[in-house]
Amino acid sequence: MDAIVAEDLHKRYKTVLALDGVSFSVRDGEVFALLGPNGAGKSTTVRVLTTLTRPDSGRALVGGEDVARHPNRVRHLIGYVAQDSGVDWEATGRENMLLQGRIHGMAGAPLHKRVDELLELVGLADSADRVARGYSGGMKRRLDIAIGLVHKPRVLFLDEPTTGLDPEARAVMWVEVERLARQESLTILLTTHYLEEADRLAERVAIVSRGRIVVQGTPEDLKAGLRGESVSVELRETDGRLAEAVQVVQKLDGADEVHLEGKIVRARVPNGAQAIPMILSALDGRGFPVASVTTARPSLDDVYLHYTGRDFAAEDEEHKPVAKAWER
């Protein structure tokens, strides 16, 4: 059974087409990721699925309920952890969770038992009676998630759950999400612009770009669909000739999806070991000193580039102001 179904969703904010025919489904008990740069439409999709925004057209079902026709039913089925926390920072972690339970009609011993279970599960039992303002960034996000689980939802939406966390706190959060998926028997839909996060956590991934889903599947299948290897050549001083270096590599037989990231020229080739001598020789012949060269199997970054023709990191940076303006 599908826990989430999105069919041809469209949403426009003034001149910005946020969703342009988004369709996908999430199986019951699955961890599913919407992966894309800032401004791609991920958060708008989640806002539609959580009844916070009505689509201009299309249909969405969560737990078998239509989000537009029966929003109250949907709200009882879901937990939602937004990018911006809804925690009362002057209350304790426990008080925040108790309030959430009461909002959902819970009370007495069952509510207190549930809160205690979740505090233990997310590693906040020892900090439960501290004012939330004093929590670290990672603790605050774990409290957000615990609050979203108080009423035992069937589906949990995590919108950019690790944004703003340092790498160590992000890794801890990944472990927590994996544990929650197992112990709570949840369907989880998470949005992220971290490639490694989607690769680590999701059973299936939908890559979102400019309001559309361009491809979806398991991370392994998506990467396996790209033949060959990625070659990265870091250049030394180039005297402003980076575009010329890209052109040099583009002319080589077998070099595909050649692009520039800073001073690094990246390309996809059938065989890295065979391609590297040709690339180095061509660059040397045009006076480009090379600092380093590496090869790697295809990544989700390569998948994004292949299906969109755009570099993930560059587009993520380019659309940060747009995301702040309309997607959140």
Map each language-model feature to its residues:
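Conserved ABC transporter NBD signature motif
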Residues: 58-69, 74
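ABC transporter nucleotide-binding domain
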Residues: 175-270
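Conserved catalytic motifs of ABC-family nucleotide-binding domains
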Residues: 152
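Conserved ABC ATPase signature
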Residues: 131-135
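Conserved ABC ATPase "signature" region
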Residues: 98, 102, 109-127
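Catalytic Walker B motif of ABC-type/P-loop ATPase nucleotide-binding domains
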Residues: 156-159
